[in-house]
Amino acid sequence: MTVETFHPKQTTTLETPAKTLEAASADSVNTGNVATGNRIGFVSLGCPKNLVDSERILTQLRIDGYEVTNSYDNADLVIVNTCGFIDAAVEESLDAVREALEENGKVIVTGCLGAKENQIREVHPDVLEITGPHSYEAVLKHVHKYVPKPEHNPFTSLIPQTGVKLTPKHYAYLKISEGCDNRCTFCIIPALRGDLDSRGAGSVLDEAKRLVEAGVQEILVVSQDTSAYGKDKGGRTDFWNGMPVKQDITSLARQLGKMGAWVRLHYIYPYPWVDDLIPLMAEGLILPYLDIPMQHASPRILKMMKRPGRVDRQLEAIQRWREICPDLVIRSTFIVGFPGETEEDFEMLLDFLREARLDRVGCFKYSEVEGAVANTIAELISEEVKEDRYHRFMEVQAEISAERLARFVGRTMDILIDDVDEEGAIGRSFADAPEIDGMVFINGETELEPGMLVRAVITHSDEHDLWAELVDADAEDEVEA
């Protein structure tokens, strides 16, 4: 049994890629007896959370007997799953809708931007239907309206238990909740996706088990607010495999860590109970990797953002975490040019970077998001100043990142292979999340395959990536684990 394969096409406006369907050869794709005239094109934009929504829609389309195509010309209808978080993402989404309309003419829009139907209709009045984010049933209902459900034999067009995936076979995103209870002034996600709505722990663990049984070697846990998982459950316990499981992020992470795959946590809000996750990393249950967006370091700006404002406590926490788990890799994101940000505020941010010594850092220039409170709370910063601060920020962090990566030189590490080309293999260590962090290059090793987990000694580094050589299995006992 085979299904279509999806490959990333990197965008320039987002940290995560658009996903489009790549055609597989006729002899490698089993479409069963899906009738022609029932082909659906699909474009997925935005973050990994949106990617999971796309996977769910695509899975149901295949279950219903539709064929998914990579060609606008061959599609009877095109679905565009949009992002609407920042202006650049909105522009990209509207461009994708425009292209689909020009190339095909029959388009359904869903996703975060779909929550702003009037904005889409003003630009693209010919769109057939518009739904908001995680509106799976509504999307399928609209598809059935314009392209009737085909007659098909479900036994000849089987779908894996894991469903259709837009990621390579060896890693997958696992979304554990929807929405967010925080009200950061620069963000409109709660308005688009609602308040926190956690999945039951049993459901999450069932999905994770299916992924691992299907060969997934890395599970990337995502949500709008991962560390808040279960807060909305009121302390209720769920059950999995007949065992009670507390519905909080620490208990969930502990159970995920027992499944034998890498477990990587993303989008961790800096709640006090994040401390409880670090021992799990030190024990090796989950990867020693913490994606914790801090956004700024000026107490004044953090207060305006409605974010935790005790930077001294954050620095103390980072030191405490590293003492418990010395291998810990911390990734964060920050905003420069937030309304009202002074040069003094920005210098506080640079000072924080120099003291915190974070491993992986992303930086965004503040973008006015329609409906965000932050747009009107203080004077907007000019584009010239934002650009200058962005480059100064990245220059400081590049030096820090180079220093942090250099500590791996000489170490032997597990490397998960993502790709192999004529020059060798490209993989990632525990320190590297796919698509947003660096890579590990193993030159000359063209016989490796994606999904392999190999041992390699790190030979050198720069501010982004590592280079390595495979370790002789016979010498494994002589090298550092």
From Swiss-Prot:
The protein's required cofactor(s) are namely: [4Fe-4S] cluster
> Where would I find the MTTase N-terminal domain in this sequence?
38-148
The record's comment on cofactor binding reads: Binds 2 [4Fe-4S] clusters. One cluster is coordinated with 3 cysteines and an exchangeable S-adenosyl-L-methionine.
Is the keyword Iron assigned to this protein?
yes
Domain of life of the source: Bacteria
Give the UniProt keywords, A-Z.
4Fe-4S, Cytoplasm, Iron, Iron-sulfur, Metal-binding, S-adenosyl-L-methionine, Transferase
Give GO terms for biological process.
tRNA modification
The name on file for this protein is Ribosomal protein uS12 methylthiotransferase RimO
Record organism: Shewanella oneidensis (strain ATCC 700550 / JCM 31522 / CIP 106686 / LMG 19005 / NCIMB 14063 / MR-1)
Q: Which gene encodes it?
A: rimO
